[in-house]
Regions:
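N-terminal regions of proteins, emphasizing targeting and processing segments when present
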Residues: 5, 18-19, 25
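Bacterial N-terminal signal peptides
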Residues: 9-20
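N-terminal secretory signal peptides that target proteins for export/translocation
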Residues: 1-7
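Noncatalytic, solvent-exposed loop/strand surfaces
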Residues: 22-420
Length: 420
């Protein structure tokens, strides 16, 4: 059954009530790239769909955005922006820029609430490609946290009531802001590289600053929490390096040279204490074992490679890494142990791919900017399982999310629930 909802027309008239949010479930897609930030789902995913087939519901959004939908219980949270640069061809007045935090019912696609946040100006007048709502939100059973760059970090409860607001810097960049917050202990941690070249931890209850680590140069990546024995490290790629921190204190523990020039956008993945990086403007990849101290380039860096991606993040599965090049439409499989490229396959008429890869039920999903999803078997031998189109005339920059054996895919105009 397919339903279409216009969220923009529902607006603030929607009552702020709904089901109580229970304890967060392990399968909840409660942050950017889902559980652990690895882009891996424990549920199965659909294989075939189109604009008219296997669409559970389709909801029109009140604005554009590149943030990934997240899911907690039976609620979806995502951000968008309106008032300026929508459409891009007639941008209008920057003073009218508004950001939205949206809460949508997972089962029906109906809007439960829309919290509007005024932008702290000035912002770059034309953030290329992805606009003003690229940071995905993060949530637990009590709160929802949204990061809007220089406008700050906002905490809401699940009824949409704002709890606090904290600023983490006033810097801007022509590419805007994109890193998503993560939760650790009682803190919400943001990569404020654009805003203050800092990594900032805020108290989840009050928004007060817990710690701040400097040196976050030219990084748009979402931090990754990596288990190392009985401890946990917070790992982030920056200009020419990967840095490891103690998430309790913000103390830098180690650094590893990447030999990758210029800025970092893709986020990291890890398995069994090994961190994998695929990214950088100049391209490249590497693996480094977490848990070291000081400069670990010689002692813990396991391999480097020349193939990478400037935008989309990889997934790890069964000893292999899978990712897409953002510009060429090529997808890669590499052996995680050695970095050796197993295959490089160009997807037919793929165009640009900004969304990060998603793994579900032994399949890797690659979503292109024009709304085509290539489903590829997650195995060393390349096998194209299917190609599915949702072209709606708008851009698909956001990474897909998985929930209840379905996919959530958003464009700059619509949010789709794909499945049966």
């Amino acid at each position: 059954v397919k339903t279409t909802t216009n969220l923009a027309t529902l607006g603030m008239a929607v009552v702020l009530c709904g089901p109580t949010i229970g304890a967060a479930r392990a399968e909840d897609w409660a942050q950017f790239r889902g559980p652990g930030g690895h882009g891996r789902s424990t549920t199965s995913g659909p294989v075939a769909w189109s604009r008219d087939e296997n669409i559970v519901w389709k909801a029109e959004l009140p604005g554009a955005g590149a943030s990934t939908p997240i899911v907690v219980g039976d609620r979806i949270y995502l951000t968008s922006y309106s008032g300026y640069a929508v459409p891009k061809e007639e941008p209008g007045d920057l003073d009218q820029l508004v950001r939205h935090l949206l809460c949508v019912d997972l089962k029906t696609g109906k809007l439960l609430w829309d919290k509007q946040v005024e932008a702290r100006l000035p912002e770059p007048e034309r953030i290329r490609d992805h606009g003003y709502a690229a940071n995905s939100v993060v949530a637990d059973s009590q709160r929802v946290f949204a990061f809007f760059g220089k406008s700050g970090v906002f905490a809401f409860d699940h009824s949409g009531r704002q709890l606090w607001h904290a600023e983490v810097g006033d810097g801007t960049n022509g590419w805007g802001t994109a890193a998503s917050p993560v939760l650790f202990g009682n803190a919400v941690i943001v990569n404020a590289s654009v805003e203050s070249q800092s990594l900032v931890a805020l108290d989840q209850k009050t928004g007060k600053e817990v710690w701040r680590a400097k040196g976050m140069r030219e990084s748009w990546s979402t931090p990754l929490l990596v288990p190392v024995g009985d401890e946990t490290e917070l790992v982030v790629p920056v200009f020419e390096k990967i840095l490891g921190f103690d998430p309790q204190t913000g103390k830098q523990l180690w650094s590893c040279n990447t030999d990758i020039r210029w800025y970092m956008v893709p986020s990291l993945v890890a398995d069994d204490g090994v961190v994998y990086c695929v990214g950088g403007r100049s391209g490249g990849a590497l693996a480094v074992r977490a848990g070291g101290r000081g400069d670990v380039t010689d002692s813990h860096r396991l391999w480097t490679g020349r193939k990478g991606s400037n935008v989309s993040s990889p997934v790890y599965h069964d000893g292999h890494l899978y990712w897409a090049h953002e510009a060429t439409g090529a997808v890669y499989c590499a052996e995680a142990k050695s970095g050796e490229i197993v295959y490089e396959q160009r997807l037919e008429r793929a165009g640009q791919i900004y969304a990060s890869a998603l793994l579900a039920d032994g399949k890797v999903y690659y979503l292109t900017r024009d709304g085509r999803t290539f489903v590829v078997a997650a195995k060393p031998d390349y096998e194209l399982v299917g190609v599915n189109e949702l072209r709606d005339g708008f851009t698909f920059n956001a990474s897909p999310a998985a929930a209840a054996n379905r996919l959530l895919i958003r464009s700059d105009r619509f949010l789709y629930c794909v499945g049966k």
